[in-house]
Amino acid sequence: MGIKNLTKFIKEKCQEAYVTENINELSFKKIAIDTPMYMYKYKSMNAAKMVENNGIYYNPDGWLWSFIYFIYSLRKHDIHPIFILEGGYPEEKNKTRMARKKDREDVKKKTLSLEESISSYATSLRLRPEDIPQDLKEEWNKIAKKNNLPFEDFDFETVKDHVKQRHRYDIRITNRDYEKLKILLKIMNTPFIQAPMEAEAFCAYLYKKKIIHGIASNDSDILAYGCNLIVDFEFDVKIDEETKISKITYINYDYLLNKLDLQSSEFLDFCIMCGTDYNDNIYRIGAVKSYELIKVQKCIENVGKFLDPNNKKGTILILNHLRIRHIFNHYGMKNIDDVTNMQFLEKKASWSSVPNFYLLTMLTIKFNINIDLEWIRHGFEKCNIKWDCESEYEENVEKTNVEETNNEVDEFPIF
C-alpha cells in the first residue's frame, strides 16, 4: 500500500527523516488513526498466532485484542485517538484493488495446492528424491537460495513451516470485521469517524486543517499528501532494570523535503513517478531514477521532454499525472460536508467518557477474545481513570447479532 518503494528509498537516502522521541510529546493531542491499515496489521498478527499454534485454540476475532491494548496504551499516555474508517475511493484505484484481490486469491490457491502436496508426501515412504512433489521442490529451492543452503538437502519440515507461514498473507477485511470493531470502539468510548473517502485522505485533510496533531499509519501515501507520518508506537520498552520508556517514530515531512532538496510539488511528482495506488510507474524507472529526474527536471512535464517519445513503454502518459496530482491535492476535501461530528473533532482534546468494563467483558465473552481484563482495568486505575458502569450502548451490545459474512469490503462508493 502507498507509494512504490518510497520508504525503502527514504531509509537508504534520508534515514535522518525518521525521528524517534518520547511518546509523551503526544500527550493531550489528537491523533488520527488510519484504521484499515491497523486492521490489516492486527489481523496479520493474529494469523501469525494461528501459524505458531498450528491452528489450536485459534480465534479469528483475536485481532480485536490488539485494538483493546492499543487504545489502553494510548489513553495511558493521555493521547487522544480518532479512528478513521474507510468510506470510498477514486475510480483510478479499481485496477490496484482488483490486482490485490487476484493476488490474494492466487496465494490462497497456491497454499492449498502446496498443503495437498505436503499431505500426500507425508503419507508416502519418502525414500527417493524423485518422489518429492515438484511444487515442494520449488518451494525448497526458494528457501535454499534465500538462506544459502544446498539445493540437494531437501528438508521436509522446513518446507512445511514455510508453507504454513503463507497463511499470514491471506488477510481480508470484511463487513463483519468493521461491525465488530465499531462495537468495540463504542464500548471503549473511543471516537471514530466514517470518512467520506479513503481513510488516509481524510486523515491528511484533518492534519492540514490543524484539527489533529499527527497521523498513525504505515501508508506512505500520507507523505504524498504532505503530512508527517507516525509509523510506529513502542509501548513500555524496557531500557534497563528501573527505567521504562514508550516511544514513537515518525517521518518528518519538512525535514525530508529539505534533505532531498525538493519543493512540495516536486516531491509529489516524485511520488507519482514512483507509482501509486492510482497509477503505474514508467517502465524501468524506479524510485532512485525518478528522484534523479525530478531533481533535475523539476516536474513530470519536463521529464516527458527528456524521455524518448518513440518508446511507448517509457512515456509519461502512463502516469496520468494531472489526475493523480488532483487526487492528492484535492481529493481529501471531497464530500467533506457529508462528515458527521466535525464540530466534535474541532473541540479541544478530552475524554468525554471512559470505557465500560461490564460491556467490554460481555464483548470478550461473545467474541471469545482471550484477554486479561483485570490487568487492563488495573492499568486504568493506576492512571486515575475510572470505569463507567452504565452506557447507552448496553442494550445494543446485548442484542448484537453481527452478520456472519466473510464478504470483503468492496461496496464502498467510487468517486
From Swiss-Prot:
Pfam families: XPG_I (PF00867), XPG_N (PF00752). One of its GO terms (cellular component) is host cell nucleus. One of its GO terms (molecular function) is 5'-flap endonuclease activity. Residues 163-297 are annotated as: I-domain. Gene3D superfamilies: 5' to 3' exonuclease, C-terminal subdomain (1.10.150.20), 5'-nuclease (3.40.50.1010). Residues 1-114 are annotated as: N-domain. Its cofactor is Mg(2+). Keywords: Endonuclease, Host nucleus, Hydrolase, Magnesium, Metal-binding, Nuclease. Its EC number is 3.1.-.-. Mg(2+) 1 binds at D34, E86, E198, E200. Mg(2+) 2 binds at D219, D221, D277. SMART domains: XPGI (SM00484), XPGN (SM00485). SUPFAM superfamilies: 5' to 3' exonuclease, C-terminal subdomain, PIN domain-like. Probable endonuclease. This is Probable RAD2-like endonuclease 369L.
